[in-house]
Amino acid sequence: MKNIAIIGASGYTGAQLTALIHAEADLTIQGLYVSENSLDKGKPLADLYPSYSHIALTLSPLSDDAKAKIVAEADAVVLATEHSVSLHLAAWFYSQGLAVFDLSGAYRFSDVAQYPKWYGFEHEYPEVLAKAVYGLAEWNAKEIAATKMIAVPGCYPTASLTALKPLASLLTSAYPVINAVSGVTGAGRKAQLHTSFCEVSLTPYGVLGHRHQPEIVTQLGQEVIFTPHLGNFKRGILATITVQLKPGTTTADVAAAYSVYDQAPLVTVKHNQFPKVDDVVLTPNCHLGWKFDENSGYLVVASAIDNLMKGAASQALQCIKIHFNL
């Protein structure tokens, strides 16, 4: 039985992960924590999320005493916190010997030079960063099992990389073009005008400048053109990706490449049949559908995930179970 502390439990991702871990026979929840300045401290989780009324846990402030209690009692800590907050908390808990599963972007790049540009801070813990493993569960299981510092991928990179990594050896130098739409929960729980019911509308954002683009590039090993879109639905991501494959590539070659997922129970691959967001919402699954034109050499692959599940909480749970061999 492994004991897990969840920091940032009042947000969509933290609450979703709480529900997932609560349902696991081999895991227990050491505690749920929020910032000492949070208006939610002291509240039962079910006050914020009535659908979790079966989870009788309260949101505690992350005081120094709480940190000491986590170190004494927990086997791992999950950080569902802002990037700049995770930066320091992850390094501290790692130094105390706990396994750290960070859902922010603070440890996703191995190159410290990336952080000022994409996250607005200098990375102060290069020695911890050097130990961090990118937690793309279907691809990095051995590394996840071997380290105590796991950077859980972003939602868009999870959808995109799950679709693209099998094709890496077949790609030409032409940039893959990724157009992805996410539900409004991807913007977080904090009230914002552009995500309010009366204002939200399908629109691109972060064009040629979204921080998930270099994350995808780093893990794929090739430049991409990535355009995210805000959708007028609650949860889910659909990424439609167009790539050019090397001359002589056949449909059979593509099918063989995607056979890498034959033993991956959470990834479904279909030829000439494309996924729908509704089919993956509230599941830990990724559905892929692809079609290849041998004459032009262009392939279109669509990837559907739940941004709060496979794109965040359920992938963190995958990483926890891989790390602890559960």
Swiss-Prot record:
It is found in: Cytoplasm. Pathway: Amino-acid biosynthesis; L-arginine biosynthesis; N(2)-acetyl-L-ornithine from L-glutamate: step 3/4. It comes from the Bacteria. Keywords: Amino-acid biosynthesis, Arginine biosynthesis, Cytoplasm, NADP, Oxidoreductase. Its EC number is 1.2.1.38. It catalyses: N-acetyl-L-glutamate 5-semialdehyde + phosphate + NADP(+) = N-acetyl-L-glutamyl 5-phosphate + NADPH + H(+). SUPFAM superfamilies: Glyceraldehyde-3-phosphate dehydrogenase-like, C-terminal domain, NAD(P)-binding Rossmann-fold domains. CDD domains: AGPR_1_C (cd23934), AGPR_1_N (cd17895). Pfam families: Semialdhyde_dh (PF01118), Semialdhyde_dhC_1 (PF22698). GO terms for biological process: L-arginine biosynthetic process. One of its GO terms (molecular function) is NADP+ binding. GO terms for cellular component: cytoplasm. The keyword Oxidoreductase applies. The active site is at 155. HAMAP family: ArgC_type1 (MF_00150). Catalyzes the NADPH-dependent reduction of N-acetyl-5-glutamyl phosphate to yield N-acetyl-L-glutamate 5-semialdehyde. Belongs to the NAGSA dehydrogenase family. Type 1 subfamily. This is N-acetyl-gamma-glutamyl-phosphate reductase.
